[in-house]
Amino acid sequence: MSFKFLRSTSNVLECQVVLLDNSHFSTTFDKKTVQGRDLFDRVCEKAQVPPNHQQYFGLQYIDREDGEVVWLNLDKEIRSSRKTKALLYQFAVKVFPQDPIKLEKDVQILILCQLKTLINLGKFSLPVNKHALIDGFYVQAMLGDFNAKRHKPGYLEDLLGLFYCPPTGINSDGNISEEEYEVMVKDLHKSHRGMTREEAVSASLGICKELENYGASMHYGGIDSHGVEVVFCVSIHGIRVYQLKNKFPEAGTLCHNFHWRDIISMFCDNAKFYMYVAEGRDEQNVTCRAFRFHKSLYGYKASQRLLVDAENHQKFFFEDNLERAKTMRSLSLEAKSMKKIRSGMAGRVNLSLRRATIT
């Protein structure tokens, strides 16, 4: 008997990915070294994401140590300590575009699927009427024109599955019964007769992009220099810092609003997160803002996650503001060279930097 066609499975890496439409994609790699980029490229091909839009997306997985969601580093090797089980990932929007309607139609649908999931999970709290407006356009996009023969009572949940979720206490600030809400959405669906799939998707995104926390990712567990618990809100505009409203994770009073054009440099040191921020238009005064995460075993992981998320978002601002990027890089190098951070303390450090000269 010849064994030349038999191969060892010890080097076979299996990955299972949940796509944005909740379908599953499985793929295997039969080589010793697999980069995150290798998996991401296959997923983008499956999801039909064109190369010029792939920067908006990423792959998430659950950190086995602290149970939090982490972005897969595409430039590093995928390592697995499990020899027989597949690695599990979620394809997700990493950075929301400022105007998703300008993207290609297939990518718009992916963005909308992500937003619908976030709304249903309670990441946004919407008035009932706005909730219904989004759903009305979404139903038109997914199911086409209303048809009384096919769209019987209960059709929204039956045909849309997890993407249909009536307002609840976690995703809406209003009260309405499921039956009343279904009638509300059905009437809106009827009113959209003749609207194409592309038009309905764009209309739904047009509402979503005006939401207060559109494109924002929240990071909890931070503490400022006064010992106050804070929440970090990272978006394509910058980093907002809120006081924690209550023990149930919720943003309260706005403490700071740092725009990307003013954030010179960011880094973390164990559980501490630092930002060099330019104060005033002349940029001669730079302040170091320091925060720390809870003194738990995994505080350093929370700090790293915030840094990765912030850098992903700031990159988009710099791509659209090249001259500003040059200025910030010059100031960043100058700030780092001064090494004025007070090690082990959270708070403010005032630095005085000369104005950067761009050549």
Give, region by region, the residue ranges found by the protein language model.
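Eukaryotic intrinsically disordered and solvent-exposed regulatory patches
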Residues: M1-K4, V12-L13, S26-T27, V43-A47, ...
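FERM/ERM/4.1 membrane-cytoskeleton interface domain
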Residues: Y61-D63, W71-Y242, M328-L331, L351-A356
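Short amphipathic, charge-patterned alpha-helical segments
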Residues: K32-P50, A310
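Eukaryotic low-complexity, acidic/Ser/Thr/Pro-rich regulatory regions of large signaling scaffolds
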Residues: P100, I223-E229, S235-T359
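PDZ domains - specifically the beta-sandwich core and the conserved carboxylate-binding loop
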Residues: R7, N11-D21, V228-H237
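Short, contiguous acidic and Ser/Thr-rich linear segments
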Residues: L19-D38
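Detector for glycine-centered tight turns/loop "hinges" at secondary-structure junctions
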Residues: N22-H24, D66-G67, N246
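Short loop-to-beta-strand transition segments
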Residues: K46-D66, K130-D135, F273-A278
